[in-house]
Design a protein with these regions (language model features):
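Bacterial N-terminal signal peptides
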Residues: 7-17
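Cyclophilin-like peptidyl-prolyl cis-trans isomerases
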Residues: 21-289
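Bacterial N-terminal signal peptides that target proteins for export
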Residues: 1-7
């Protein structure tokens, strides 16, 4: 993607003898207060749009330079009133261009690609699957794939490679054909699109308002360019908003028993088709004024 250019079958078993009734598995217990973690206001991006509010948790562990750029531009009001100029249904919604054509960017220099990151033993990471030679799980709310821990001992920095996975709600940075050409334009995933993995920098994930992302006006044409597009009306870090206007978000802690039960439930429901993208981490949002 350049700046201009993302049933289950039901089986019935007939028994020769009497039909044996099977009780449905009880739902997991409601999470306890300790099963939640608060997102810091300095890592919560508040995107108000003409269709409603989107809240994005930033992930500086994955892309520190890109997160710093998003914070800088938000603080300067750069994103206010910019269009969602490229929106493709079943793919993504793109914005951040002051020209509204796909050719614009901020006055700051382009960023070096942060397509992968280094994960050490001190980085908070919750695995949910372990395919051969890899671990798949979460850093904060962001789904990631990484090399296994046992490879850390053999690396110079005692860390292993990891990268964000483009599940619904994941926030990525748009760029031109060159790897180091991201600047101000970004996109939010409407659906999963794994072809983007390790090709575009992941810097966060929508934790509230995915329905808003999916409601943004989409283009009827393959290029995704939208006429009379929806707009971002204001973009700020929660920390930069007045206290009375500041939303707060509690995310289910991925280290909790409640989260493990949620993962088990998703795995049982999907069977062999289970993917980390099937896991929706619950959030409790206090909207603010």
């Amino acid at each position: 993607m350049v700046r201009n250019a993302l049933a289950a079958a039901v089986l019935s078993a007939l028994l020769s003898g009497p039909v044996l009734a099977q009780e449905a598995s009880p739902p997991p217990p409601p999470p306890a207060p300790t099963d939640w973690r608060a997102i810091s206001p300095s890592d919560l991006l508040v995107i108000d749009t003409s269709k409603g509010r989107i809240l994005v948790e930033l992930a500086p562990e994955l892309a520190p330079a890109h997160v710093e750029r998003i914070k800088l531009l938000a603080a300067r009001g750069f994103y206010d009133n910019l269009a969602w100029h490229r929106v493709i249904d079943w793919f993504m919604a793109q914005t951040g261009d002051p020209l509204g054509t796909g050719d614009g960017q901020s006055w700051y220099p382009d960023l070096k690609g942060e397509f992968t990151f280094r994960r050490g033993p001190d980085m908070a990471f919750t695995p949910v699957a372990a395919p051969t030679g890899a671990l798949i799980g979460f850093v904060r709310s962001v789904p990631v794939q990484t090399q296994p821990d046992d490879l850390m001992a053999g690396t110079g920095d005692k860390k292993v490679h990891g990268w964000g996975l483009y599940c619904p709600g994941v926030a990525g940075m748009a760029r031109d054909e060159g790897n180091d050409t991201a600047n101000s334009q970004f996109f939010l995933m409407r659906q999963a699109y794994p072809a983007l993995d390790k090709r575009y920098t992941v810097w966060g994930r929508v934790v509230s308002g995915l329905d808003v992302v999916r409601a943004l006006k989409a283009s009827p044409t393959p290029d995704g360019i939208v006429t009379e597009p929806d707009r971002m009306t204001r973009v700020r870090l929660a920390a930069d908003l007045p206290q009375a206007e500041r939303p707060t978000v509690q995310m289910m802690n991925t280290t909790s028993a409640a989260f493990r039960a949620l993962v088990d439930q998703a795995r049982q429901a999907k069977g062999a088709d289970f993917s980390v993208c099937d896991i929706d981490i619950p959030a409790q949002v206090t909207p603010g004024a």
